[in-house]
From Swiss-Prot:
<feature type="domain" description="F-box">
    <location>
        <begin position="11"/>
        <end position="58"/>
    </location>
</feature>
<feature type="repeat" description="LRR 8">
    <location>
        <begin position="258"/>
        <end position="283"/>
    </location>
</feature>
<feature type="repeat" description="LRR 12">
    <location>
        <begin position="380"/>
        <end position="404"/>
    </location>
</feature>
<feature type="repeat" description="LRR 2">
    <location>
        <begin position="94"/>
        <end position="119"/>
    </location>
</feature>
<dbReference type="InterPro" id="IPR001611">
    <property type="entry name" value="Leu-rich_rpt"/>
</dbReference>
<dbReference type="InterPro" id="IPR001810">
    <property type="entry name" value="F-box_dom"/>
</dbReference>
<keyword id="KW-0433">Leucine-rich repeat</keyword>
<feature type="repeat" description="LRR 13">
    <location>
        <begin position="405"/>
        <end position="429"/>
    </location>
</feature>
<feature type="repeat" description="LRR 10">
    <location>
        <begin position="322"/>
        <end position="347"/>
    </location>
</feature>
<dbReference type="InterPro" id="IPR032675">
    <property type="entry name" value="LRR_dom_sf"/>
</dbReference>
<feature type="repeat" description="LRR 9">
    <location>
        <begin position="284"/>
        <end position="309"/>
    </location>
</feature>
<dbReference type="InterPro" id="IPR006553">
    <property type="entry name" value="Leu-rich_rpt_Cys-con_subtyp"/>
</dbReference>
<feature type="repeat" description="LRR 5">
    <location>
        <begin position="171"/>
        <end position="196"/>
    </location>
</feature>
<feature type="repeat" description="LRR 7">
    <location>
        <begin position="229"/>
        <end position="257"/>
    </location>
</feature>
<keyword id="KW-0677">Repeat</keyword>
<feature type="repeat" description="LRR 3">
    <location>
        <begin position="120"/>
        <end position="144"/>
    </location>
</feature>
<protein>
    <recommendedName>
        <fullName>F-box/LRR-repeat protein 14</fullName>
    </recommendedName>
</protein>
């Protein structure tokens, strides 16, 4: 688009374009390369682009880091979102942005509201302290920042009064939790993500206190290796009193490797999320049917449920059947979740599945009663050709993903052509399907996308023409 303008009008005519037209042109360019090319076409475009550039993503190519960062801040005076990402960094690529670099950023980027620091291994608590001079900072994401401690996060909480979104991922030295207490008093956090921060456990979340009222999104994941070394220590969860957790605003809840203690702690959270729309439970120990039933009876707006269920072999210390999810949970979901669009089940170990968990009939009941658009089954050994036949009546189903579903054969796969609304099919590591099962799809124009990965009896030739777009990969190392 901008090339045509330059050719037809020349530099002089472009300089005479009304401001609103220039802004409109710039707003329609979404890639950095396009905007850079346009800004080089004339001085006016260069100047206006600098004024309108609100986001910046930088990383290994920033050398020397502090000087280059200063130059960028001066060139783009209205930056509000900055991402500094050093994924794949090596020492030969030059020094990373450090505490001095953050000082440069906070001193010269006065409109900063959203900052992401990923793999920034040179930044310490001192650098995080510089963020206190950013009064408008509302979002901070730290991904693998090993030199930052709880003291640094506390200084952030004290200095950045408008912080609404905080992500801490693999911040291994964030040990103290005074910052959680401080946020609990402020009652300002709306989105909190804590993943694989080894020193932070379920029991520490109680320190949020009244901040639970404001939270709309909580993602909390315990480091799996650290958890297993503690052998499912119940001390953390015992610190939670049996009380009502005020979490009416929570819309998204994601828990990984967590202990769900009956009647307290995160179990109270599950039972009081009446406005929840998205639930993800990944390898959470102790979740019971009563927890799910209590949740779905209140959360009538649930649209997405994802469950990764521990197997019997994975949890040798928990043999209480009452602490397992069964068809009672699926029946409750089917009865109360009239808006459910996405449902995913995954078992952690297909060779040692839970003997007391979901049955085929329970899964079929849910699919038949809920308007599910996306269904994903991973290591669900009970799902077979009868299940595929039941999907023929799933009027809303558009996306189906089967992973390690070894009981599905060509007989079931052939039925895909009869699914009323299906347009995306994904098959991975399924031993029972072959090229014969794909034949009815070839040339049928039924599917928009077909993804086949690591299915040993399906060939590239067999999937050719089976969908508008086909992705085929085969790596059979998983079988050996």
């Amino acid at each position: 688009m901008f090339i045509g303008i330059a050719y037809l009008g020349g530099d002089r005519q472009m300089d005479e374009l009304p401001d609103h037209l220039v802004w409109d042109i710039l707003s329609k360019l979404h890639t950095t390369d396009d905007r850079n090319s346009l800004s080089l076409s004339c001085k006016r475009f260069f100047s206006l682009d600098n004024e309108q550039r609100y986001s910046l993503r930088i990383g290994c190519g920033l050398v020397p880091a502090s000087d280059a960062l200063l130059s960028l801040c001066r060139r783009f005076p209205n930056l509000s979102k900055v991402e500094i990402i050093y994924s794949g960094w090596m020492s030969k690529l030059g020094k990373q942005v450090d505490d001095q670099g953050l000082l440069v950023l906070t001193t010269n980027c006065h409109s900063l509201t959203d900052l992401t620091l990923s793999f920034c291994t040179f930044i310490t608590d001192v650098g995080i302290g510089h963020l206190s001079s950013c009064p408008e900072l509302s979002s901070l994401k730290l991904n693998f920042a090993p030199r930052i401690t709880g003291c640094g996060v506390l200084s952030l909480a004290v200095g950045c009064k408008k912080l609404r979104r905080l992500h801490l991922i693999r911040c291994l030295n964030v040990a103290s939790v005074e910052w959680l207490e401080y946020f609990g008093k402020l009652e300002t956090l709306e989105e909190l993500c804590i993943k694989n921060c080894r020193a932070i456990g379920e029991g520490d979340l109680i320190k949020l206190r009244n901040s639970w009222r404001k939270l709309t999104s909580l993602q909390f994941e315990v480091d799996a290796n650290y958890r297993y070394m503690k052998v499912y220590d119940q001390l953390d969860v015992e610190r939670w009193p049996k009380q009502l957790v005020p979490c009416d605003s929570l819309v998204e809840l994601s828990l990984g490797n967590c202990i769900i203690a009956p009647g307290r702690g995160l179990a109270c959270v599950l039972r009081n999320c009446k406005n929840l729309e998205k639930l993800h439970l990944d390898m959470c120990t102790g979740v019971s049917d009563s927890d799910i039933i209590a949740l779905v009876q209140k959360a009538s707006h649930l649209r997405s449920i994802s469950l990764r269920v521990p197997s019997d072999f994975t949890l040798p210390l928990l043999n209480n059947i009452t602490l397992r999810l069964t068809d009672e949970s699926l029946s409750a979901i089917a009865q109360h979740c009239s808006k459910l669009e996405s449902f995913k089940i995954s078992f952690s170990d297909g060779e040692f599945p839970s003997l007391f968990s979901f049955t085929l009939q329970g899964i079929i009941t849910l699919i038949q009663k809920c308007p599910v658009r996306e269904l994903s089954l991973d290591h669900v050994c009970v799902f077979n050709d009868m299940g595929m036949e039941a999907l023929c009546s799933a009027q809303k189903l558009e996306i189906l993903e089967l992973v390690h579903c070894q009981e599905v054969s060509d007989e079931g796969l052939i039925l895909v052509s009869q699914f009323p609304s299906l347009n995306v099919l994904k098959l991975s590591k399924c031993l029972g399907v072959t090229d014969d099962g794909m034949r009815p799809l070839v040339g049928s124009h039924k599917l928009e996308l077909l993804v086949v990965e690591d299915c040993p009896q399906v060939s590239r030739r067999g999937v050719h023409g089976a969908a508008t777009s086909v992705s085929f990969k085969q790596d059979l190392s998983w079988m050996y």
